[in-house]
Structure formats: structure tokens, C-alpha cells
Design a protein with these regions (language model features):
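Aromatic-rich carbohydrate-recognition surfaces in CAZymes
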Residues: 1-42, 60-64, 68, 188-206, ...
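Short, contiguous acidic/charged loop-to-helix segments that flank catalytic cores in large enzymes
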Residues: 118, 136, 180-189, 202-210, ...
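Acidic/His metal-coordination segments adjacent to aromatic residues that form catalytic metal sites
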Residues: 36-59, 173-184, 238-246
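Generic long, charged, amphipathic alpha-helical segments
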Residues: 160-194
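Catalytic cores of carbohydrate-active enzymes
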Residues: 14-27, 32-33, 68-173, 216-217, ...
Length: 263
């Protein structure tokens, strides 16, 4: 790791700080900015011609949660390898301060999906600020996020990509390509998001037998799904509204992988 991987990781961090293509760069507050114009640089990437379904230009919540975890991991590695370089720790501290200042939305009791435009749309991306190993949030905020995601987005086999109370909510992934693209990240539930959700749920409720039983029960709909659609596998996406029919790829690797990981 020290010889082959660690130098590459240092180059990656350095490039994010300096900036690269698609308006990806570290701002003065330590947070990562990404995207501009018609570029779609997060996983919510639907674009048809000049139409962008979910523009998330700015500082996306999950990208900055991952950025913080990358910095904390680098600090652990530099300590292990005796580099005596505290720059990662210092930058992580700045990111943590900026993240709490910019992303917490008092009105919704959870995180903005993107800043600096302050997109208060309730989406599942914020779950990674809780589920990842290194957290920037206090326990009260973590619990509030998990409660909001459970109430608004959890549908059994996945998390909705958009709050059902939002005016742009499109829950059914069916019809023409245009209709499906409108729903893909605007109400459709995604199976792979269950992994982060279950991890976050266990984290905020404590690693107790009772929590494990509750988390296991949250996966009951997945067990039922394994007997339908593609037997023994998990679909890519599900309709946001009941009965939450499986859609998209009928056997999706990251849906399966994330459920196995958290199980």
C-alpha cells in the first residue's frame, strides 16, 4: 500500500485541491464544488440533449461526505507511514466546520442536497453523511437525518430519489424514454441506497440486539422481492409509489452488493 497505492492517493487529493475538469475543485471553505452547464457529474446524471433532469451543480452533499472521509483516511495512512504531515487533519477540520455551517437546514431538520444554491430538496444522498465511517455531524443531527429519510424516502426495497411531497415527484418508471427519464432520479426508489440507509440506522440506534432485529425487519421486503422479478436477485430501481414494482435492470450488482454488505 505504501509503495504503490499511497502515492496515487496523494495525487488524487492534490488534484481535487487544485481543480480538474468539469468544474471540480476545492473551494476556499474546503468543500468540493462539481459541475456546470450541461455537465452531470454525480450519480444522478440523466441528460437528454440540452435537458438536465436533476441539475446538482455546486457542492453535493454525498461528494463532500466522501471528501471528508478521504481526508480522514489519508491522515490515518500518513500517521501509519510516519510522514509527519498534519495537512490532511487540518483540512478535514476545516471541511467539518464548513459542512455543518453550510449543509444543515433548520427548516427541514436535515441536510441540503446541494449548496451553494441551497437546494433544500429532500433526497437520499444525505444518508452518506451518516453512514460513512468518519462523521462530521453530532448524534442529534445524525438521528434527525435517519428519521427524515425513514419517514420520507424508505419504501422497503430502496430509498426514493425524491421526497413524495415535492412538486417534481415522478414515482412510476414506465412509458416513453422521456417519461422514464423524468422519473429516474425524481421519485424512483433505488435498491443500492439500502446499504447506506441500514448502516446509518444501526449507527444512530446503537449496535444492540434490538437494533439488529429492527434493521433485519427493514430488509423483509427485500426477502420477498428475491422470490419475484429475477429470482434470487435485486432490481436496480422500484416505483416510488406502492406496490413499488421492480423496474430497470432486473439483477443489479450494486443493489445486491450493498444489501449483502450491510447484512
Amino acid at each position: 500500500i505504501k509503495k504503490d497505492i499511497y502515492p496515487c492517493l496523494k495525487d488524487i487529493i492534490s488534484t481535487y485541491k487544485k481543480g480538474t475538469d468539469f468544474s471540480i475543485y476545492m473551494d476556499t471553505d474546503g468543500l468540493i464544488h462539481a459541475g456546470s452547464g450541461l455537465d452531470q457529474v454525480t450519480w444522478m446524471d440523466v441528460r437528454v440533449g440540452d435537458w438536465v433532469a436533476t441539475p446538482r451543480h455546486g457542492k453535493p452533499v454525498e461528494i463532500n461526505a466522501l471528501w471528508y472521509n478521504a481526508l480522514c483516511t489519508m491522515d490515518m495512512l500518513q500517521t501509519k507511514f510516519g510522514d509527519n504531515d498534519d495537512s490532511y487533519r487540518q483540512l478535514a477540520s476545516l471541511v467539518k466546520t464548513s459542512f455543518n455551517k453550510r449543509f444543515w437546514n433548520e427548516n427541514t431538520g436535515c441536510l441540503y442536497d446541494v449548496v451553494d444554491e441551497d437546494d433544500d430538496t429532500i433526497r437520499p444522498n444525505q444518508i452518506y453523511a451518516v453512514s460513512l465511517p468518519f462523521t462530521m455531524l453530532d448524534k442529534e443531527r445524525e438521528k434527525a437525518i435517519v428519521d427524515t429519510v425513514t419517514d420520507k424516502l424508505y419504501v422497503g426495497c430502496g430509498l426514493r430519489s425524491l421526497d413524495p411531497d415535492h412538486k417534481d415527484y415522478h414515482p412510476i418508471y414506465i412509458g416513453s424514454l422521456s417519461k422514464r427519464d423524468h422519473a429516474y432520479h425524481q421519485g424512483t426508489a433505488w435498491g443500492f441506497l439500502l446499504g447506506g440507509f441500514i448502516s446509518a440506522y444501526v449507527k444512530v440506534n446503537g449496535r444492540t440486539k434490538e437494533t439488529a432485529l429492527c434493521a433485519d425487519k427493514l430488509l423483509d421486503p427485500v426477502r420477498e422481492h428475491l422470490l419475484n422479478n429475477c429470482i434470487g436477485s435485486i432490481c436496480e430501481i422500484f416505483d416510488g409509489d406502492a406496490p413499488h414494482n421492480g423496474r430497470g435492470c432486473y439483477a443489479q450488482a450494486w443493489s445486491v452488493g450493498e444489501v449483502l454488505r450491510c447484512y
